[in-house]
Regions:
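Catalytic cores and adjacent binding grooves of peptidoglycan-active enzymes
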Residues: 66, 71, 79-165, 170
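Surface-exposed patches in mature extracellular/periplasmic domains of secreted proteins
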Residues: 40-51, 101-108
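A broad, low-specificity signal marking well-ordered, structured residues that form hydrophobic/aromatic
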Residues: 46, 75, 111
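The substrate-binding groove and active-site-proximal loops of carbohydrate-active enzymes
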Residues: 16-20, 74-81
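Short, surface-exposed glycine/acidic/tryptophan-bearing loops
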Residues: 49-76
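N-terminal accessory interaction module
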Residues: 173-174
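Active-site acidic/histidine clusters and adjacent loop/turn architecture
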Residues: 1-45
Length: 174
């Protein structure tokens, strides 16, 4: 699907195999990955804890039968730093806002992101905290992690290495 995401990560967890996720959502998730990769703590992976859901399964896990997950325009994500620890939900939300996500919700240990708009969803914009029920957050940008001050990318015939602030944050052998 993309460099950091596979279609199977987005498939409905009930076993129905529904997996018609929006390519625009996946592209925006790649933007989140790219932003975190440029921070001093890097990005090891973004894990999709919930992608598309069928209308039967979504209410069973706290959603609705016609929510953004059922439309293929939402994902619940956890972002891991290069050292394997997690970014906090507020940092993920801040980066998602910077990347243009229009639906963002803080969750315990994860962050809901979606690409709702007036054509595909009842309310075109929503920032909230699902932990507290506060559905009127105006911005998360105060939690935006800083970018690295130096970066380099090197490639040999068989290895791609990305360094930020002197630390290797990504390495892939081909």
């Amino acid at each position: 699907m993309t460099a950091h995401f596979d279609r199977s990560e987005f498939t409905c967890k009930c076993g129905c195999d529904k997996s018609d996720i929006s390519p625009d959502l996946v592209n925006k998730l790649e933007q989140i990955y790219a932003y975190f990769a440029r921070t001093p703590t890097g990005c090891k992976a973004i894990v999709i804890t919930s992608g598309i859901r069928c209308s039967t399964y979504s209410p069973k896990v706290g959603g609705y039968s016609n929510d953004a997950h059922t439309k293929g325009i939402a994902a619940d994500i956890v972002v891991y730093k290069a050292d394997g620890t997690r970014y906090v939900a507020e940092q993920i939300a801040a980066v998602a806002e910077k990347c243009g996500f229009s639906g963002i919700g803080l969750m315990n240990g994860a962050c809901h992101v979606d690409i709702r708009n007036k054509n595909n969803y009842v309310n075109a914009h929503w920032f909230g905290d699902e932990r507290t029920g506060n559905n009127s957050i105006t911005s998360f940008l105060g939690y935006l992690p800083p970018l690295a001050t130096s970066q380099s990318v090197t490639a040999s015939k068989h290895t791609l290495t990305v360094n930020f602030d002197g630390k290797t944050i990504f390495e892939k052998e081909f």
